């Protein structure tokens, strides 16, 4: 017979299998927006935001979307990985993958697992390993901050490029509207003997 800890952990694993991790989401997205975006794949039970502790607020964030069953979760993952899926007007599509147990804040303790710790003395054989791990953690932190900086620069560059493109297209459409409303296009059509001018 299973212990209460094992039953709780099994329920948690079932919840993990029903959950999708969505990344590259704009910080302006809210829970109702995300729910309505993913309700087209099935019923959304819960939306949990994963805060970004490592960088500024402008960075894209992640969210855990719990669906009603595993089939809906697989539908979300397959559709979002094959086709671009935009949420809340973000200029780039979001990414989706299956959630993992360590992504949850309320993860229960694994049954039968105990955490042990001890102080290591400098003459201990594991002391050198611990120092190397500590150095490696610092190196990873520096690499991570560098990558976050580069990611922000790329996002800003992409945003400027898209803004310039939008302004250019808007000017073109304004010029076309002006030509049509002023009658210049009709005069040119008459001049070049084009019949059946579609506008006006």
Curated annotation (Swiss-Prot):
Query: Could you provide one GO biological process annotation from this protein's UniProt record?
Result: regulation of post-transcriptional gene silencing
Phenotype caused by lack of the gene: Hyper-dimethylation of histone H3 lysine 9 (H3K9me2) in several genes. Impeded use of distal polyadenylation sites at intronic heterochromatin (HC)-containing genes (e.g. histone demethylase gene IBM1) resulting in a lack of functional full-length transcripts. Silencing of transgenes such as 35S-SUC2 and genome-wide CHG hypermethylation at gene body regions, leading to reduced transcription of several genes (e.g. IBM1). Abolished expression of At4g16870, a transposable element (TE) of Copia-like retrotransposon origin, associated with methylated status.
Q: Does the keyword Lipid metabolism apply?
A: no
SUPFAM superfamilies named among the record's database cross-references: RNA-binding domain, RBD
An example of a GO molecular function for this protein is: RNA binding
- Which ranges carry the RRM domain? 18-101
Per the record's keyword annotation, is RNA-binding included, yes or no? yes
The subunit structure is: Component of the ASI1-AIPP1-EDM2 (AAE) RNA regulatory complex composed of at least AIPP1/EDM3, ASI1 and EDM2 and may contain CPL2, AIPP2 and AIPP3/BDT1. Binds directly to ASI1 and EDM2 and may function as a bridge protein between them. Co-associates with EDM2 to histone H3 lysine 9 dimethylation (H3K9me2)-marked chromatin and transcripts at a critical proximal polyadenylation site of RPP7 to hamper proximal transcript polyadeylation/termination.
Q: What is this protein called?
A: ASI1-immunoprecipitated protein 1
